[in-house]
């Protein structure tokens, strides 16, 4: 995925662009999120993503010059034989998500969630189309340290579950390919769903 444009008509314009961040775009991302403290968590997440080869996806509204938010995550896949069937184990570990505080509640987080869901769907579809496995197990991991982050993760898990349900509905009756979603989320102090009042990033 180089660049994805998401049109969210229910939220009105502008469109949202999400793209994988390359080394030359790191400084623009740091400026765009509105954080100047090099020791804060969002900057650390960006630096760690670069240092450890994590996926770093940015988002910006309309055709603006600077990205204004991002999500950093690891994506790993392996295949193993269990009994008489091949199982693909796909792990997604969310390390950080952040949107410029002045722009929250406008749809940036939704665009980032949709992009991650699209990436997972494309990965599963490739495994199925190429016959790599009879079954896919998706492991989604995250540790929530803020209410906004927990809200984002909860919505992302819901998006992924709906995506997997739709993929399952599209299969023919004689298709034995299976998808299993395993939620390994640590919501910490934000485990009470009724306690969420802050808008998602």
What are these regions (language model features)?
Residues 1-103, 114-139, 144-201:
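Non-catalytic substrate-recognition and accessory regions of acyl/acetyltransferase enzymes
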Residues 106-111:
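A short glycine-leucine-enriched loop at secondary-structure breakpoints
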